[in-house]
């Protein structure tokens, strides 16, 4: 159907109208733009008559219509791009005057979120004529987009910037902020992560906001999570702290000779995962000055049996030194590519001016090395050693360092903020540990967990960041962390002024961390007794059985009444006794005036093993010989004289040892392996729930009379005694299921409930309530009859839970978990993944998850490759296993995959390293596929 608006159709219509209706009708048709659907051959000559006067109009209409179409299409594209980026800018205010963002691009690029026009509009709307941009990436753009206020720094990728450049940029930023209180600095690199973060962190140190790298890094993690600072970045932040200290340290200019490099043990980078073929590159800044890479066949391949890698270097360096080691492998077996490729094993970077003059060895452990992102390829105790020698003569330098003759005493940190309140909030935020940082102490003390509180090894206090200013190059006596960067074999003390990161320099306020103060004695239960200074180290042997029983029933031994009134007698169930690795003096009550409503922790309401307060002359077994009442039985009045021992988790600021019997959190679980419940300690054969707290206890002269009826029929007709408030030890019998049975006029509750009965008559039917009953000490703790154990299946099945909860807290601090239904890692592999996720880049972790179980399986990798491609990749279409049956199909799909992920096509892109890793895994799998003869799937 002809479009009446088309220029060609309009001209044809004009010719037909002129031939049919004459000159006047032709003019009317021309003005109206009408067209006739009928064209007869006899009137064809009219077309040629029209050309003379209508040719100009023909091309004019074509031009106008084309212009309108292009304008409409362009406006639609611009609107779609604006809607895509609007409100989705990668833009972070670290402070009100320091801004971090990702790279702004001129055109539409899927890999970048920020468009130059959007960023410029945003900055002009808020900081017009008061902002300058610092481009840290080697990639550039038109500076006119930001009014020509762009500083091109061109920092290298995947390494720390030179110390000279880092200091100079910080000084430039400070001068810009000093010119006008409204000025702001906008910092960006390719992704707005590592390079931008080290500059902002160095700026915090430059402005004297922080004197150590730790708070600066924590603030960056809080403001912009996932910054991904490498050990070299942290090392250079430490250098900045030394340069800007109260008594600044000035790096020397003496050359450094690297004699050799030793790596031990041998990492696993070859296809067999039993060695590597290494070579080493040495760079000064971005310039490579030495490499040991030669012909592939002439290079030595080290195996695990060799124990270490030794490569002589004998190269002299000065300034920012980078040492990188690579594994060389050949892809000659591949038909697609016949060339040699490399994989980085590690990289380290340091400044030679911070090496002490008498240093001969530099040692780097795995946490102090860059690019160690695949833990499976590095054996345990992996370390790198550099044999070095510092030359005695200074080397003449061309450029004067920017820190020479620069005084930072007048620098005010308030220049980074717009208000005093913002300054205080930022300082508080820098003192908090970020959520995504790995904890310094991964061992988590469970609530009331006894074994979790034991000192299995010496715990050393975490070194402050101030003491870490030069710790990068000396051996430290403390535990290693991510911020301790280098260790040396040189002695700690040196009389000369040249010191490394962490070394002790003259005039530097630095000293060894003092011993932690003794834990504050806090009277959590309001006992306010007299202080006791018992020498816990004098306990030479564990107490005997008689001493255990004496302490169990409230006594302190048989040595005399003088010890009975002493509050600091060692309780064998307390960690300060012989079984504890820590000794903490305790306060014990001298009166029964504790608050009856005080609850410290969840399980501290009742401690059956705590010694009750009593006069010095009181009989040890007086609570069992006199007439029982609710006011005299410590087992029936848990709040009358509470135990001074509470859970360690009740308050984190006080070091209080947990109770070994009541602190295992067994008071909330059935089948606890203990003796702390009311039922087990006082009346195991009473009511099905134990003795009510308001009922008087029958008088007896035998404290063990309650144990005499353990084998009676009444005991055999009910399930295991439920655990009481203290987390008790039920009678030793097979695990039974709770079943409702009428016993003593009450209804039995399932075992393990936190219970307190209010009934007043359940003890009238107890068979042992009569004093004439003789205790039976020959009781047999036999299992419940089979028929009895099957009764409770209809109500509550607790057998499985009972077994699972018995030893739940024994190994909780080591990452083991007894409950399968709880969240968290249940296998070693999951725990390893959880640790890897804390330190590893998410993209590289995604690669590991992709190849897990599919190593060198070309079909499995190709069929799942769509799950690991970077965002925005649309060329690759997912394939199924049905498309990879024959070798020809595999070859075709593999070639198509290589065209998508080849590293040469990703040069300069942020996903270049990511594409390289995918390509190498596919290449390994293809080589394995060829070596196996390219067999079909079936």
From Swiss-Prot:
Region 3 X 4 AA approximate tandem repeats, annotated ranges: 61-72
GO CC annotations, alphabetized: clathrin-coated vesicle; extrinsic component of presynaptic endocytic zone membrane; postsynaptic density; synapse
Cell compartment(s), UniProt: Cytoplasmic vesicle, Clathrin-coated vesicle
Residue ranges the record marks as coiled coil: none
Modification comment: The N-terminus is blocked. Phosphorylation at Ser-595 modulates its ability to bind CLTC and therefore the synaptic vesicle endocytosis (SVE).
Chain residue ranges for the region called Disordered: 19-41, 467-801
Domain Phosphatase tensin-type: 80-247
Sorted UniProt keywords: Chaperone, Cytoplasmic vesicle, Hydrolase, Phosphoprotein, Protein phosphatase, Repeat, SH3-binding
J domain boundaries: 874-938
Molecular-function GO term, any one: heat shock protein binding
GO biological process: one example: regulation of clathrin-dependent endocytosis
Motif (SH3-binding): 434-442
Sequence repeats: 61-64, 65-68, 69-72
Superkingdom classification of source: Eukaryota
Record flagged with keyword Amino-acid biosynthesis: no
Effect of a null allele: Mice have a high rate of early postnatal mortality, although surviving pups have a normal life span despite decreased body weight. Knockout animals have impaired synaptic vesicle recycling, with an increased number of clathrin-coated vesicles, and impaired clathrin-mediated endocytosis of synaptic vesicles in neuronal culture. There is an up-regulation of Gak, but this does not fully compensate for the lack of the protein.
Active-site residues per Swiss-Prot or TrEMBL entry: 189 (phosphocysteine intermediate)
Residue ranges constituting the C2 tensin-type domain according to the UniProt record: 253-391
Enzyme class: hydrolase
UniProt-listed InterPro entries: C2_domain_sf (IPR035892), DnaJ_domain (IPR001623), J_dom_sf (IPR036869), Prot-tyrosine_phosphatase-like (IPR029021), Tensin_C2-dom (IPR014020), Tensin_phosphatase (IPR029023), Tyr_Pase_dom (IPR000387)
Quaternary structure, from the entry: Forms a complex composed of HSPA8, CLTC and DNAJC6. Interacts with HSPA8/HSC70 in an ATP-dependent manner; this interaction stimulates the HSPA8's ATPase activity. Interacts with CLTC; this interaction produces a local change in heavy-chain contacts, creating a detectable global distortion of the clathrin coat. Interacts with AP2A2. Interacts with DNM1(GTP-bound form); this interaction allows clathrin-coated vesicle (CCV) formation at the plasma membrane.
Task performed by this protein: May act as a protein phosphatase and/or a lipid phosphatase. Co-chaperone that recruits HSPA8/HSC70 to clathrin-coated vesicles (CCVs) and promotes the ATP-dependent dissociation of clathrin from CCVs and participates in clathrin-mediated endocytosis of synaptic vesicles and their recycling and also in intracellular trafficking. Firstly, binds tightly to the clathrin cages, at a ratio of one DNAJC6 per clathrin triskelion.
Annotated domain remarks: The J domain mediates interaction with HSPA8/HSC70 and is required for basket dissociation.
Name of the protein described by the UniProt record: Auxilin
Organism the protein comes from: Mus musculus
């Amino acid at each position: 159907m002809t479009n009446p608006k088309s220029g060609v159709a309009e001209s044809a219509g004009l010719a037909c109208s002129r031939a049919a209706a004459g000159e006047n009708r032709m003019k009317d048709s021309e003005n109206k733009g009408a067209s006739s659907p009928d064209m007869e051959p006899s009137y064809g000559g009219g077309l040629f008559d029209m050309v003379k006067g209508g040719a100009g109009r023909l091309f004019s209409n074509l031009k106008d219509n084309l212009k309108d179409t292009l304008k409409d299409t362009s406006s639609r594209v611009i609107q779609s791009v604006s809607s895509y980026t609007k409100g989705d800018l990668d833009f972070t205010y670290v402070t009100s005057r320091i801004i971090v963002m990702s790279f702004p691009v001129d055109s539409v690029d899927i890999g970048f979120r920020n468009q130059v026009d959007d960023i410029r509009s945003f900055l002009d709307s808020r900081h017009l004529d008061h902002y300058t941009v610092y481009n840290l990436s080697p990639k550039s753009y038109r500076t006119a987009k930001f009014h020509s206020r762009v500083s091109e720094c061109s920092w290298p990728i995947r390494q720390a910037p030179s110390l000279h450049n880092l200091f100079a940029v910080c000084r430039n930023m400070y001068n810009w902020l000093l010119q006008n209180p409204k000025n702001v600095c906008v910092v960006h690199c390719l992704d707005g992560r590592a390079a931008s973060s080290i500059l902002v962190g160095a700026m915090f140190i430059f402005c004297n906001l922080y004197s150590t790298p730790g708070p600066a890094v924590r603030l960056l993690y809080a403001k912009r999570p996932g910054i991904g600072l490498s050990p070299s970045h942290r090392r250079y932040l430490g250098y900045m702290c030394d340069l800007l200290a109260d008594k600044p340290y000035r790096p020397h200019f003496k050359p450094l000779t690297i004699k050799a490099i030793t790596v031990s043990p041998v990492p696993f980078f070859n296809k067999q995962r039993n060695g590597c073929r290494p070579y080493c590159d040495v760079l000064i800044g971005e310039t490579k000055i030495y490499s040991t890479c030669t012909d592939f066949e002439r290079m030595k391949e080290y195996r695990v049996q060799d124990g270490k890698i030794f490569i002589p270097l004998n190269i002299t360096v000065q300034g920012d030194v980078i040492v990188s080691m690579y594994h060389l492998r050949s892809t000659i077996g591949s038909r697609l590519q016949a060339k040699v490729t490399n994989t980085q094993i590690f990289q380290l970077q340091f400044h030679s001016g911070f090496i002490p003059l008498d240093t001969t060895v530099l040692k780097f452990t795995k946490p102090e090395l860059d690019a160690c992102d695949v833990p499976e390829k590095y054996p345990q105790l992996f370390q790198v050693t550099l044999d070095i020698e510092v030359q005695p003569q200074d080397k003449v330098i061309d450029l004067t360092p920017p820190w020479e003759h620069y005084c930072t005493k007048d620098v005010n940190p308030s220049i980074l903020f717009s208000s005093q309140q913002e300054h205080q909030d930022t300082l508080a935020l820098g003192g908090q540990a970020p959520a995504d940082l790995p904890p310094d102490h991964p061992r988590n003390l469970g609530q009331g967990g006894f074994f979790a509180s034991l000192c299995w090894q010496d715990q050393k206090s975490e070194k402050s960041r101030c003491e870490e200013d030069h710790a990068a190059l000396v051996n430290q006596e403390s535990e290693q962390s991510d911020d301790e960067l280098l260790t040396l074999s040189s002695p700690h003390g040196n009389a000369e002024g040249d010191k490394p990161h962490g070394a002790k320099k003259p005039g530097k306020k630095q000293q060894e961390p003092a011993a932690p103060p003794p834990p504050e004695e806090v009277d959590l239960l309001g006992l306010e007794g007299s202080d006791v200074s018992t020498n816990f180290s004098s306990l030479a042997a564990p107490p005997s059985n008689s001493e255990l029983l004496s302490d169990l029933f409230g006594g302190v031994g048989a040595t005399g009444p003088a010890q009975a009134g002493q509050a600091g007698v060692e309780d064998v169930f307390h960690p300060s006794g012989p079984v504890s690795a820590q000794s903490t003096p305790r306060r014990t009550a001298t009166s029964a005036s504790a608050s009856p409503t005080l609850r410290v922790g969840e399980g501290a309401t009742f401690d059956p093993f705590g010694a009750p307060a009593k006069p010095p002359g009181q009989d040890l077994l007086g609570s069992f010989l006199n007439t029982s009442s609710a006011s005299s039985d410590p087992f029936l009045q848990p709040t009358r004289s509470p135990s001074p021992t509470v859970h360690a988790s009740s308050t984190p600021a006080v070091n209080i040892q947990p109770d070994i019997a009541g602190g295992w959190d067994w008071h909330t679980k059935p089948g606890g392996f203990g003796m702390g419940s009311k039922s087990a300690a006082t009346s195991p054969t009473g009511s099905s729930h134990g003795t009510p707290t308001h009922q008087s206890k029958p008088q007896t002269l035998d404290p063990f009379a309650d144990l005499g009826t353990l084998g009676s029929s009444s005991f055999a007709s009910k399930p295991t005694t439920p655990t009481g408030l203290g987390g008790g030890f039920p009678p030793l019998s097979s695990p039974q299921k709770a079943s409702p049975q009428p016993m003593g006029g009450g209804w039995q509750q399932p075992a393990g409930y936190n219970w307190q009965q209010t009934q007043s008559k359940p003890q009238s039917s107890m068979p042992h309530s009569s004093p004439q009953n003789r205790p039976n000490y020959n009781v047999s703790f036999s299992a419940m009859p089979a028929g009895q154990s099957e009764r409770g299946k209809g109500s509550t099945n607790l057998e499985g839970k009972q077994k699972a909860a018995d030893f739940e807290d024994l190994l909780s601090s080591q990452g083991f978990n007894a409950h399968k239904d709880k969240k968290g890692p249940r296998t070693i592999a999951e725990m390893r993944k959880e640790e890897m996720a804390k330190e590893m880049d998410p993209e590289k972790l995604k690669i590991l998850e992709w190849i897990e179980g599919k190593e060198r399986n070309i079909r499995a990798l190709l069929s799942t490759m769509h799950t690991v491609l970077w965002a925005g990749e649309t060329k690759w279409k997912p394939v199924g296993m049905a498309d990879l049956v024959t070798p020809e199909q595999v070859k075709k799909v593999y070639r198509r995959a290589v065209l998508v992920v080849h590293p040469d096509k990703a040069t300069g892109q942020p996903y270049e390293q990511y594409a390289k890793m995918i390509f190498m895994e596919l290449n390994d799998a293809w080589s394995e596929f060829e070596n196996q003869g390219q067999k079909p799937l079936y």
